[in-house]
Amino acid sequence: MGKYEPPYTISNKMLELVSSISEKVGKISSHRELEARPHLRKNNRIRSIHSSLKIEANSLSLAEVRDVINGHLVLGDQKEIQEVKNAYAAYEKISEINPKSMSDLKKIHGIMTYRTVGESGVFRKGEEGVFSGDRCIFVAPPPNMVNELMKDLFSWVKNSEGTIHPLIMSAVFHYEFVFIHPFADGNGRMARLWHMVMLYRWRNVFEYIPLESQIERFQAEYYDAIAQCHVNGNSDVFIEFMLSMIDQALDEVILQVNKTNESMSEYVKRMLEVMEYDVPYTANAIMEALHLKSKDCLLYTSPSPRDA
């Protein structure tokens, strides 16, 4: 039996998007201050987690997700709260994960679904399908095929390293993973996380890119692309969709960085570095974070409405 090759065809649109993304990643990487901003990394990670869970119908708000991650008391559904804790723990492992390891996949799934599903960290033992109301619109491969299909997929990733661009490979993996539906629950969250892990291994700037938030904005199109691929029997539509999402997410980051560099004073840049996204701050809290001695200093360093 020959090596497994996921069906897809490289298009001119894919090549154009890969070129555009590569250029934008280079621009962002040249702004070395991104790497020195742990608050930016954490804020974007919180956004990623909130969006990925929201896609799967978790009802907690961005502020509530942040509070859970920061250890504050949140009144809400306990399963949803546990999902946030699990997702944060899983995302914190990104730099340690080997994206070519099936054992790592199961281990991270065990973290992602801790205390929320019965079959945690193991491939599913039952049939799975996708329903629209009472109508089944997709039937996943039978459970006795899952292990072999996942072995084939990971073998393809290993054998294709260096010959297939990571931007293409990660999108193909994402779709194939969703098609196989290897776990009883958490497949969407794991597919999006593994996509990010593969991108991070290519360029670590993706640690700061909340791609999941872009997907959440275009959630209907995300599922439409997957459904079209099921019908077409290849992942072409999904590859183009995901490359477009990455390209747009990078545009937002570049605009953010350019605006900061062009219009903000050094003190304001410091404020942005220490302040968390979507969190209200008192003057005293900002003074303490910036080591300022008086509110006069704070007023002098604050951005004008034009800069905000």
Give each language-model segment a name:
Residues M1-S302, R306:
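FIC/Doc superfamily catalytic core
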